[in-house]
Amino acid sequence: MAELATRVQELHHLLNKYSHEYYVQDNPSVPDSEYDKLLRELIDIENAHPEYKTEDSPTVRVGGEAQATFNKVRHDTPMLSLGNAFNEEELRRFDARVREKAGKVEYMCELKIDGLAVSLKYENGRFVQGLTRGDGTIGEDITANLRTIRAIPLRINKPLTFEVRGEAYMPKKSFEHLNQQKEEAGEQAFANPRNAAAGSLRQLDSKLAAKRRLSIFLYSVNDFTNFHAESQSEALDELDELGFKTNQNRKRVSDIDGVLEYIKYWTAHREELPYDIDGIVIKVNDLEEQEELGYTQKSPRWAIAYKFPAEEVVTKLLDIELSIGRTGVVTPTAVLEPVRVAGTTVSRASLHNEDLIHEKDIRIGDSVVIKKAGDIIPEVIRSLPDRRPEGTEPYHMPTHCPSCGHELVRLDGEVALRCINPKCPAQLVEGMIHFVSRQAMNIDGLGTKIIMQLYENEIIKDVGDLYYLTKDDLLPLERMGEKKADNLLNAIEASKKNSLEHLLFGLGIRHLGVKASQVIAERFETMDRLFKVTEEELLEIHDIGDKLATSLITYLNNKDIIALIEKLRRKNVNMTYEGIKTSEIQTDSEFNGKTVVLTGKLHNMTRTEASKWLEAQGAKTTSSVTKNTDLVIAGEDAGSKLTKAEKLGTEVWSEDEFIQKQKEVENK
């Protein structure tokens, strides 16, 4: 058995070495047949002796048992998106904002890979968890699928604990191979490599994900505790040394003119790459300067994404279809002769509203120019009258709602036509789709098709009915099995615990967005209190205007809405605010207004728990030590951050000192 254990270790070493050479260094030293032979040997050993199978065995690359669903997990640090720039002027404005606060800076330019953002967590050098971006705060655990990507090391060459983020993508060759297989099987092909990558990583069966030949580029470190890097370029170099795959087409430049030269080059050469890119990411290189520049609520101030100009193509307008949104707005959509735009097959595009259709004189049968704004949303930008066939007529919107037949109206100050019938079937269905969405009640698995079936079969008439669904209601639906029905009912049950702001946003009250829902829920705390709120009380809140105040009061005074809320209450849907209130932040705390960095391993709490406590005291927690840092709390094995704090003369506490201070604060 000792010989067998030695052989298993040897196979691990060889397979990891050959995989790294092929998928990361792009320089294989052995043919595929040799790798496959060794992998087969290891699989056979593990099948005969399961005690030798480990979580980081190279055999996990081929996938494992199918999962029932993906667990939702909160990111330790939110995965923020980047602000966008579409031209030189916007880039120069970004540069001016940076220089105004940080002075002359060096930039790091990186290719913006068109894939799926993921976060990888390592503990003591082993890959233990991988999450999707999700909504930036909560992602889905797709660890099993990410383990099948051979460019992701299952174990690195140092016993470090940290988180690294990157973009999983499908190379062009893998995409072509996959679509060829789909076409041969009579299945619908993927529109582009990005969709194929996202779809592959959301396969519940990791064996299927393993066949999709995905790869990854890592681009950022979430926690620099165990790193020596003082810049983005040094961080990427350290990732290289640890065995991660980073994009080697990155470049440090001294100013915005260097950024523009880099963009010019890759705009001309992007098609030569073996993978898709949809822009360039520009980051301030120095980590201390990044910290000084800080963040907005949505994105870092020290980085921006330049998006390539939209590609324009000509195709034929076959028809104009109308859709009714949850607020009753009637939106015209162009039905097109399918055409490839920016790597995607497009058959539908936005026409916005009737005024724009008339202004551009767009007619059914026309040849039209379409583009994908930001390489994402297709829209019709103009018609080509010189190619117009004889007999075409100017397009006119209907006078009555296509869904319910109610007369359409145009409200004062609006260009859109709107159906104002509150019982319009199309609006009710769209309202339900909104209610279950991620930022609202977040009912996973309850998609458009299921909602449509439930509504058309008269099983549900409003969102309240969702909480009265039974397995017997669900099982007759298309593609609905026992397990799927159970998962759906569990997701509905779990949504009852959501904080009040999720319910408010989910109700689809006109003019009420995510942020305003949060502010109002925090201010008034319960739905009962909201039913008694006055317009004057609402207008006292910063950022709540006349339109929203009037809309909310009108909504809450509607007898049908009162009945709906009672219907939800009878099923124990939470109607109170569960978050930390701004008013509860201890403004008199000695931590209030201080910038604190947590580093090293804490034994009595997680760093997330420590951060939440500090933030409740009015402190701001950040990830790197700068001259603006007031305090560093250093746990076990604190690394370069502790060294830097000592160098800057920043106050440093041990975990024991921090716990003692917590007790003093809480006993005041």
From Swiss-Prot:
GO cellular component labels: cytosol
Active site: 112 (n6-amp-lysine intermediate)
HAMAP family membership: DNA_ligase_A
Catalyzed reactions per annotation: NAD(+) + (deoxyribonucleotide)n-3'-hydroxyl + 5'-phospho-(deoxyribonucleotide)m = (deoxyribonucleotide)n+m + AMP + beta-nicotinamide D-nucleotide
Protein name, per record: DNA ligase
Cofactor: Mg(2+); Mn(2+)
Chain's gene name: ligA
Keyword Hydrolase appears in the UniProt entry: no
The organism of origin for this protein: Staphylococcus carnosus (strain TM300)
